[in-house]
Every structure is written in C-alpha cells, then in structure tokens.
A protein has these predicted regions:
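Extended, low-polarity segments enriched in aliphatic/aromatic residues
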Residues: 29-328
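Bacterial Sec-dependent N-terminal signal peptides
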Residues: 1-26
Length: 328
C-alpha cells in the first residue's frame, strides 16, 4: 500500500548578497492544496528507477532526451549505465549532455565522446552532445543577472525530457540536483560561462558574487522548464541520492561519501524535488559510518539552498511538498 508522509519544508536564511555559511531553518508547515507531490523509493536499482518513473504517471512521448552527467572520470560518482539502462531503453530515450567549460576530459566534443565511450554509455543508448553543432538562446523570465539562457542547439530536437540527476554536493553551488542538471548541465560551454559569471561574460571563466551565480542557475533552469512546457512537450524530474560526496561529478577525484545512500525521488516540480532531497540531508541524524555533516556543511558554506529559494520566488515551483513512498 502506498504510504504518504507530509514533510515540513526546511529553508535557509534569505537575503545574503555574498557567500556566507547559512543554517537550514524550518519553514511553517504546508497547508492542504499547496504542496507538490514527491515520490520516493529506497530501492536504488534499475527496477526502482523504472518504478519511480511510472509512479509519476507522465508518459514519455515523441523524441525523448534523458539528461545525465557523464562524469569527469571513472572515479566520479556519476550514475552508472547499469543503473539507468532499463529506464532509458523503456522510453526509447537518447542520453543528452553538453561540453564543459573548464577543460578536462569533457571540454570539447572529441574528448567528451571518448569519455562517454569509456564510461559505457554508448552501450545502452544513443548519446547526443547537444552543443556539438552550436547553441541557441532561450528566453528567461528573470533578467536580474542573465538576459537569456544559452543551451546546446540540439535541445530543440526533443519533445520530452527526463531530467535524471545525481544528487550530491558541489564545490561551487553547495549541492547539485535537478535544478543544476538543467541549468549548468543543459547550457553550452558559453552558457556555462555566462551562468557562472552571473551574466558578465560568455568567453572566459569568471566567478560571480555567490548569490548572483545561484540566482542565474535558477533563472536558467526556469528557461529550460518553460521550453518543455510548450504545447506537445513535457519534462519530469528524478534525483538519485546515492554516493553523495561533497564533490560534484565534474570532479575527477571526489572526496569519499560520508553519508549512506538514501533513495530515489521524483516529481513534476523541480523545486519541490530538490527541496525534499535537501531536507532528507539536513534532517539526517548522523551516526558512525553514516555522517551527513560534511555534506550539510558544504551546502551551508556555499549558501546552496538559496537556489531553491530563488527558484520558488521565480515561480518555477514550490518548496512545499508531500512525500509519497512507493515501497510496499
């Protein structure tokens, strides 16, 4: 039988213009009719991933993009082909990625394709590097920092996107989930530079004021969401909470995870989904061999929860949610 648990959304202190450590604080309880639904399973397996997709009740259609991170190296904690194969093949999906902005093993298409082959992704599906043949601009609702979102041109080839993210820490954003996966992740190389710089440049690596960077990510995430909410298109969101290092999958030598795996969560609301995952991390009671404190500290140090706060302000979704377990 399906079990439903209503969770209180936890929020970070608002209003900091620079990057200061912030403490996760509780928000008022949700009221009926306001909460988004977030589905959850503790079964981190190919079968569990398919079941969480099916629980959403939104059928992938047309040309389906499955947005993943291919990982900087085999030492990274990216989602492995064996885990995602069944879902990708069930929806006849194409794995999609974009080149990075920091060099490394995925800084250009040739290197990226070699990395994709080495990881084994070619063995389970077609892989499309969306900015291989250029980029396009998507409109943004919020022009406080970025004036548009620069994404791989192949994005326009797809009718449906499954944003399949690995939830973990991040050296710059504090954490990475579905919002990062469709902002930085869907952006072309120039688009990544544009977001990281808070709209200052598309041609060189420039670090923005921390909140400007986080707010730019939220604005870019909304641009992609809105693109797939046009008639005939759609998008859904999945976070896999395993191998949760404090470091992102763009790190070829990440710190070892200190917190044990939690599960897979999914929603049609990206803000609610990332908020639910944050709350699971911050509500976690640490014990020997299962310590959430390093990840909590990384998120707080980078003011990471401001991304979901700002995304909610933009109308991308809500931080209020109900978790529905699909486990028996």
């Amino acid at each position: 039988m399906t079990k439903t648990t209503t969770i209180m959304a936890l929020v970070c202190i608002l209003g900091m213009a620079s990057c200061h450590a912030q403490t996760h604080q509780p928000a008022p309880p949700t009221t009926e009719g306001e909460a988004a639904t977030v589905y959850m399973t503790t079964d981190i397996s190919p079968e569990g991933l398919v079941r969480i997709y099916e629980a959403l009740g939104v059928e992938a259609h047309g040309r389906v993009a499955v947005k993943i991170s291919t990982g900087e190296s085999e030492n990274s904690n990216h989602l492995r082909p064996a885990l995602i194969k069944n879902l990708v093949q069930k929806v006849n999906g194409t794995l999609v990625e974009c080149n990075t902005a920091y060099g490394g093993n995925r800084g250009d298409t040739k290197k990226h394709r070699q990395a994709i082959a080495e990881r084994g992704y070619n063995d389970i599906a077609t892989v499309d590097i969306m900015d291989e043949e250029g980029e396009i601009q998507l409109p943004v609702k919020d022009t406080k920092h970025i004036q548009y979102d620069i994404v791989g041109s192949h994005l326009q080839n797809y009718d449906f996107m499954i944003n399949l993210a690995h939830f973990k820490g991040h050296a710059m954003g504090g954490f990475g989930g579905v919002l990062k996966n469709q902002s930085i992740g869907v952006a072309s190389t120039a688009g990544k530079l544009y977001i990281h710089s808070g709209g200052k440049t598309q041609t060189r690596w420039t670090i923005a004021n921390q909140d400007a960077f986080l707010e730019s990510m939220a604005a870019a995430a909304q641009a992609v969401h809105d693109y797939f909410k046009q008639e005939g298109k759609d998008i859904i969101y999945i976070n896999v909470m395993n191998n949760m290092s404090v470091d992102c999958d763009c790190d070829g030598h990440p710190a070892a995870p200190r917190i044990k795996d939690i599960g897979i969560l999914a929603s049609t609301d990206p803000v609610a989904l990332d908020q639910a995952c944050l709350d699971l991390v911050f509500n976690h009671v640490s014990s020997k061999g299962n310590d959430a404190k390093p990840l909590q500290e990384r998120i707080n140090k980078k003011h990471g929860t401001h991304t979901v706060e700002y995304a909610e302000q933009l109308g991308l979704g809500t931080r209020k949610y109900t978790i529905v377990s699909i486990d028996d």
